[in-house]
Regions:
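Non-transmembrane alpha-helical segments in soluble domains
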Residues: 4-8, 24, 28, 97-104, ...
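Extracytoplasmic/periplasmic substrate-recognition and gating elements
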Residues: 9-13, 50-123
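Conserved C-terminal helix/tail region of periplasmic/extracytoplasmic solute-binding proteins
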Residues: 150-228
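A ligand-binding cleft/hinge motif common to bilobed small-molecule-binding domains
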Residues: 39-55
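Alpha-to-beta junction loops
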Residues: 29-41
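Short helix-initiation/N-cap motifs at beta->coil->alpha
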Residues: 15-29
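Glycine-centered hinge/linker elements that transmit conformational signals in sensory
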Residues: 1-18
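An extracytoplasmic/periplasmic, membrane-proximal ligand-sensing/linker region
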Residues: 124-157
Length: 228
């Protein structure tokens, strides 16, 4: 219920929004003021906002810690692209291993991180002073991103979604249950307001305990299909 109250409810009330494929796109068009995103997404963060008239305004990036529930434990999500050595010839496998060894050396990995926003993969390289010593040309925005990210890693327990059969399908269930449902219901609220209802009247159906319980039981039944 806490997730519902802190994601779905403000979304239906119009406090949260999602229009483009990525939230950094929504910042660029001025539709949102901030978002929770990955470190790599910050490399696409715009320096200007353009409104419907075509006028452009300069903006600055401010990086903040990921939000947490009050009195909650210190956890942060760890997610991103990975590398594996696939089946191949003996020479291909050896070459792949050598590349991974080279790529994960601190200096090489830091160069990649500064350019992409992906975090270094070793504890030694996840240090902003070490990063700046390797790449002195780091931009102010990337320095801010990596500095905050270092703190997130060191001050939190990192977790990730464990692999299980049909795990992507289960994840899609949750995405549709939260994101898609919230957007659809917000669209309905907008339509009702356009027809003359007050915001309170238009939102009432979706903010009831009955609506939450119906939603919860529906999601629960879908997720139970993936139990091992």
């Amino acid at each position: 219920r806490k997730l519902w109250d802190n994601y779905y409810v403000p979304y239906v009330k119009g406090y949260f929004s999602a229009f483009g494929r990525f939230r950094s796109d929504d910042v660029k068009t001025g539709n949102v003021l901030g978002y929770v995103g990955s470190t790599s997404s910050a490399t696409f963060f715009p320096t200007q906002v353009s409104d419907d008239s075509g006028a452009a305004y300069d903006i600055d990036l401010k990086v903040l810690p990921c939000p947490k529930f009050k009195d909650g434990d210190d956890y942060a999500v760890q997610q991103g692209a990975g590398m594996v050595v696939t089946k191949g010839s003996e020479d291909e496998i050896k070459a792949s291993i050598e590349f991974l060894k080279w790529f994960t050396q601190s200096e090489n990995n830091i160069e990649f991180s500064v350019g992409s926003g992906y975090l270094p993969v070793t504890k030694e390289a996840n240090n902003i002073e070490k990063i700046k010593s390797v790449d002195s040309d780091i931009s102010s925005s990337m320095e801010e991103i990596l500095t905050e990210s270092e703190a997130e890693i060191n001050d939190n327990n990192l977790y990730y979604m464990h692999a299980f059969e049909n795990g992507n399908d289960a994840r899609t269930v949750l995405q549709e249950a939260f994101g898609d449902t919230a957007q659809q219901d917000r669209n309905t609220v907008d339509e009702r307001i356009a027809q003359g209802e007050s915001a309170e009247e238009a939102e009432a159906e979706f903010l009831s305990d009955e609506y939450f319980e119906q939603w919860y039981q529906n999601v629960l039944s879908k997720l139970q299909a993936y139990e091992g």
